[in-house]
Regions:
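Conserved phosphate/anionic-ligand binding catalytic regions in large, soluble enzymes, centered on
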Residues: 8-26, 226-245, 287-295
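Alpha-helical support elements that line or immediately flank enzyme active sites
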Residues: 19-32, 243-254, 299-307
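Early transmembrane hairpin of solute transport permeases
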Residues: 22-91, 104
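C-terminal regulatory domains involved in ligand/effector binding and gene-expression control
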Residues: 69-203, 211-212
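Accessory "access/gating" subregions that flank catalytic or transport cores
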Residues: 170-254, 258-282, 286, 394-402
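Contiguous, well-ordered alpha-helical segments that form the cores/surfaces of helical PPI scaffolds
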Residues: 215, 219, 240-250, 265-273, ...
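Functionally critical mobile loop/hinge segments
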Residues: 302-402
């Protein structure tokens, strides 16, 4: 299992799988062919179906075009067997002869993969345990918590990296709360974060608390939709959940930054378990793998901050994911706006509820986090492609008919 640095990726929106991943792939291909006369890039499946809305072509062209002309070919009806987000890069010489064809897949969260023989294009594994049942047992045997397991496995600079992650998350909230106007794209969707923030301050504490959480999640998600700088947690489409929960708890409970970083480490571990054993790609398993996993991560982080035991933390995360099972990924017009932005706000509130629910228990429950991850994976594979980031079904289809 990889470092949580590869889960928390700092970059620009609107999509980790459709923008960040293709941009990274283009950069890698350019390094191999800096003298190419031209490039041809074929996008398949979900990448082609919603690539325009996610600015996939823009990310690739911005990277390659300064070197040579780029042709983009769209194949939304062709799904390569390894993953729905496939793309083939071709480098051509001055005689239009192909120098190399390279097929690569954007598998979610900004990560890339080539095929079953070379599944990941990343750094080596750093975790020796790959499911939460084993890690929970380790916590019980050693008396340590999840973040301490992260500390044992990661390099020493992990805390510096998480500090940068936290700073980026807070900056996105601050920018989003100040920004006004309309988000990019044909929906002409107005930003709401600043309005929610102002209105929330006028309520008494109980309602104010929930309104502020909404405003923070909206702020980050709207920044992402505008192509702003955010952190995948675990994806761009779900990037508002974790910052909203952690920022709210730090402001309301005065948690020091180091405790927030430990909560980020714990949340990252849970997100990593899902990424390794299932998927965090909306094109592969639907929105349950994005917003659902973000809710699980935020639930675990919140429960740790409030002193939860390893069993209670695992229970909070399990509920955060379980109650998003079956959630479809059906972005209207292929944009990370409707229903994505509102879902971030709701998931942040759900994470706080999962934390509270777990806090009232001793952590004992029937359905384990690992089991829910397995069910999420199977549910995602059972979902038709209509509901997995193709904008051909669900809300996206109904919106076209309105």
């Amino acid at each position: 299992m990889k470092s949580i640095k590869e889960l928390y990726r700092i970059g620009t929106g609107p999509s980790s799988s459709h923008t960040m991943g293709p941009r990274k792939a283009a950069e890698m291909f350019l390094e191999r062919h800096p003298d190419a006369a031209s490039f041809k890039v074929t996008l398949y499946g979900s990448l082609a179906a919603t690539g325009k809305g996610h600015m996939t072509d823009v990310a690739i062209i911005d990277t390659l075009h300064p070197t040579a002309p780029v042709e983009i070919v769209w194949q939304p009806k062709v799904f390569l067997p390894f993953h729905p987000n496939g793309m083939t890069f071709a480098a051509l010489d001055s005689n239009d002869k192909v120098q190399e064809n390279w097929t690569v897949y954007s598998i979610g969260g900004g990560a890339l993969a080539e095929n079953n023989d070379n599944p990941t294009i990343e750094s080596p594994d750093v975790y020796d345990m790959e499911n939460m049942t084993e890690i929970l047992q380790w916590c019980e045997d050693t008396g340590k918590s999840y973040w301490e397991y992260v500390k044992e496995c990661e390099e020493e600079d992990i805390w510096d990296y998480l500090a940068e992650v936290w700073a980026t998350m807070k900056d996105a909230i601050h920018r989003g709360l100040e920004a006004e106007g309309v988000l990019p794209g044909p929906l002409n969707l107005r930003r709401k974060a600043s309005t929610y923030y102002i209105r929330a301050t006028g309520y008494k504490q109980s309602l104010q608390s929930r309104g502020l959480v909404f405003s923070y999640a909206l702020a980050v998600s709207e920044e992402n939709a505008s192509g702003g700088k955010i952190v995948t947690a675990p994806t761009c489409g779900s990037c508002g959940v974790m910052p909203a929960v952690l920022y709210h708890l730090q402001n309301s409970r005065d948690f020091r930054d180091m405790r927030i970083l430990r909560a980020l480490a714990t949340a990252g571990l849970f997100g990593n378990i899902v990424k390794f054993n299932a998927s965090i790609s909306g094109a592969e398993v639907g929105c349950q793998g994005e917003v659902g996993v973000a809710c699980a991560m935020a639930s675990a982080a919140a429960n740790q901050l409030f002193g939860g035991s390893p069993a209670q933390i695992e229970y909070a995360a399990e509920m955060g994911l379980e109650h998003h099972l079956g959630m479809t990924c059906d972005p209207v017009c292929g944009l990370v706006q409707i229903p994505c932005i509102e879902r971030n706000a709701y998931a942040a509130a759900r994470a706080l509820d999962a934390n509270l629910y777990s806090a009232f228990t001793d952590g004992m429950h029937r359905v384990s986090f690992d089991k829910v991850v397995q069910v999420m994976k199977q549910t995602g594979h059972d979902l038709p492609s209509l509901y997995k980031e193709t904008s051909e079904g669900g809300l996206a289809k109904d919106y076209k008919q309105m």
